């Protein structure tokens, strides 16, 4: 990673931790909910988010929702996080294979991408069922890199109430995980949704996260041109254009459903519900 980017993305771990923990507390109070439910996958994003949630409130519940495509190491690391958070009485293990098989059989598909999205959406349904039972919010685990790239399932892992690490790039999440004292194996593990066997984020995207984060930061935080990024990072312009395109074509994933404006007070375009009523 270019030294300028490394310095720019370096975070004050204590300050970031304190800020996010306080914001979680505030948002739970504002939402009039008792706590948060979270899915833990064994990856760094869910591990960091679960740790921050546990620091914010004692009222948290963890769901482990493996499938046949979940690597054993991910399930092992999920249980490692249960121990790390002393949450032996605050979790539930639910294998989703039978539910996913029922869905895929009904729609008569063996397409791995469709089935992968079904898996993500089944997990969302389970999270919200537990959230309703417990009167909790669903706490999402997406980071800024994934959100910008659209590397999540709409109404799947993207279907949540709050995204505590949504303004941290993947490399920053790893920094924070290290500062929080998470197991090294989890902090450094290659990211993967594990929606099918052998899937890795970097393999699917074709670019490593250090390069992705460098491009995203320069392009969308500093508003640099493609040519400037190519010159600074010394990478082919095709890679910069690919990242740029992924952000543009996934914009619909980051927005609420489009409402076609007919009146002078259309929701979202003319009238927005305030975060807090005065």
Swiss-Prot record:
Q: Which domain of life is it from?
A: Archaea
Arranged from A to Z, the UniProt key words for this protein are: ATP-binding, Ligase, Magnesium, Metal-binding, NAD, Nucleotide-binding
Pathway note:
Cofactor biosynthesis; NAD(+) biosynthesis; NAD(+) from deamido-NAD(+) (ammonia route): step 1/1
List, in alphabetical order, the GO biological process terms annotated in this UniProt record: NAD biosynthetic process
* Positions that bind Mg(2+): 45, 146
Q: Which GO terms describe its cellular component?
A: cytoplasm
Q: Which InterPro entries match?
A: NAD/GMP_synthase, NAD_synthase, NH(3)-dep_NAD(+)_synth, Rossmann-like_a/b/a_fold
Q: Does the keyword Metal-binding apply?
A: yes
The Gene Ontology terms for molecular function here are: ATP binding; glutaminase activity; metal ion binding; NAD+ synthase (glutamine-hydrolyzing) activity; NAD+ synthase activity
For this protein, the record's Pfam families field holds: NAD_synthase (PF02540)
Q: Which residues form the signal peptide?
A: none
**Reactions listed under catalytic activity:** deamido-NAD(+) + NH4(+) + ATP = AMP + diphosphate + NAD(+) + H(+)
Look up the EC number in the record and give it.
6.3.1.5
Q: What class of enzyme is it?
A: ligase
Query: Which positions in this protein are listed as binding ATP?
Result: 39-46, 141, 170, 192
Family per record: Belongs to the NAD synthetase family.
Its function, per the record, reads: Catalyzes the ATP-dependent amidation of deamido-NAD to form NAD. Uses ammonia as a nitrogen source.
Q: Which HAMAP family match?
A: NadE_ammonia_dep
Oligomeric form and interacting partners: Homodimer.
Record PANTHER family: GLUTAMINE-DEPENDENT NAD(+) SYNTHETASE, NH 3 /GLUTAMINE-DEPENDENT NAD + SYNTHETASE
- Stated name of the protein: NH(3)-dependent NAD(+) synthetase
Q: Which organism is it from?
A: Saccharolobus solfataricus (strain ATCC 35092 / DSM 1617 / JCM 11322 / P2)
Q: What is the lineage of its organism?
A: Archaea, Thermoproteota, Thermoprotei, Sulfolobales, Sulfolobaceae
Q: Which gene encodes it?
A: nadE
């Amino acid at each position: 990673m270019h030294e300028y980017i490394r310095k720019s993305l370096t975070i004050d771990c204590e300050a970031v931790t304190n800020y996010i923990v306080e914001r979680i507390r505030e948002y739970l109070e504002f939402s009039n909910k008792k706590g948060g439910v979270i899915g833990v996958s064994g990856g760094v994003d869910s591990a960091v988010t679960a740790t921050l949630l546990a620091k914010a409130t004692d009222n948290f519940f963890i769901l482990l929702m493996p499938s046949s495509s979940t690597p054993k190491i991910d399930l092992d690391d999920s249980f490692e996080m249960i121990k790390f958070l002393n949450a032996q009485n605050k979790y539930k293990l639910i294998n989703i294979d039978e539910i996913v098989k029922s869905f895929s059989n009904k729609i008569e598909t063996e397409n791995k991408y469709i089935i992968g999205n079904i898996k993500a959406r089944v997990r969302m349904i389970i999270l919200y069922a537990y959230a309703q039972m417990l009167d909790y919010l669903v706490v999402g685990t997406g980071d800024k890199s994934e959100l910008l790239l659209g590397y999540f399932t709409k109404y799947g892992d993207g279907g949540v109430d709050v995204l505590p690490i949504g303004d941290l790039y993947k490399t920053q999440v790893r920094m924070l995980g290290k500062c929080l004292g998470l197991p090294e194996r989890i902090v450094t593990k290659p990211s993967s949704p594990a929606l099918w066997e052998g899937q890795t984020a970097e393999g699917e995207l074709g670019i490593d996260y250090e390069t992705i984060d460098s491009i995203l930061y320069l392009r969308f935080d500093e508003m640099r041109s493609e040519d400037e990024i190519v010159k600074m990072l010394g990478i082919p312009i095709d890679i910069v254009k690919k990242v740029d395109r992924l952000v543009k074509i996934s914009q619909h994933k980051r927005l609420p459903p489009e409402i076609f404006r007919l009146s002078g007070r259309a929701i979202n375009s003319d009238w927005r519900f305030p975060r807090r009523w005065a």
